[in-house]
Amino acid sequence: MGYVKFKDPQTGEMWRSDTDLHLIRESVSVGRPDVKTIELEIPGASGLLDCSEIFGKRLYDTRPVAIACGKTIADRYAQDSLVKNALHGKRLQIFLSEDLEHYYLGRVSVGEFAVSAGIGKVTISAPKCDPYKYRAEITRRSVTVPDSGTLEVVLQNEFMPVAPTVTATAAATIAFGVVTYSIEANKAYKNLDMELAPGSNLLRIYAAAGTSVMFEYQEGSL
């Protein structure tokens, strides 16, 4: 049956469905995010002009997540309060035991707690989670510029478009496709024009030999 972990990204506090909330996970439903579309009617022309990828990428709406739980309990009201006090109304990371390397992020709502024949039933839902499931750990890649002063780096990205935060121990220039920008030493930079695509992304670094450069970014997938 598995379990669910809920984590508050602000405080780091975590609740596991079975050991902390004393719930048995019965089923999980993870909906798909609808595609955001931009369609224009062209007077005098048949059909529609589809501009959905005018920004060079697919865009998505929110997605729903719902977890149905049950539990044999002696005190319905104590159980109801325990779960609602922990989760209800909070924007939380939701981890499923089948895929603990990713989490969904959304505002959680705890439904009505019903009891029938001593069995408690409750649905915990997050109807408007972010469209992507995020990697549990931020991706970090550190490289060192060789004596030549030039280094090619390939950054792997799961799927979600993301611009990495770049920090260097000395002044450096980063080139990515047609985008080139300079960074100062020991300052964090994020250039939204340097957005990683799914898969392999080639960058070039120009800096003094021995300069260390750190790339940090949040990966995600549908």
PLM features per residue range, with description:
Residues K5, Q10-T11, P127-D130, E195:
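Mixed-charge, glycine-accented linear interaction segment located at domain edges/termini
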Residues Y132-L222:
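Intrinsically disordered, low-complexity segments enriched in serine, threonine, and glycine
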Residues G2-D8, L92-I94, T173-F176:
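Short polybasic amphipathic segments
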Residues M1-E39:
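Polar/acidic, low-complexity leader/linker segments enriched in S/T/G and N/D
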Residues K5, A66-S109:
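Short, acidic/charged, Gly/Pro-enriched secondary-structure junctions
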Residues M14-H22, Y103-V110, S182-A185:
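Short amphipathic beta-strand/extended segments with alternating polar/hydrophobic composition
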Residues V30-G31, G89-Y132:
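Short beta-strand and beta-hairpin "edge-sheet" elements
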Residues I38-P43, G47-I73, G118-Y132, N201:
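Oligomerization/assembly interface segments of phage tail-like spikes and tubes
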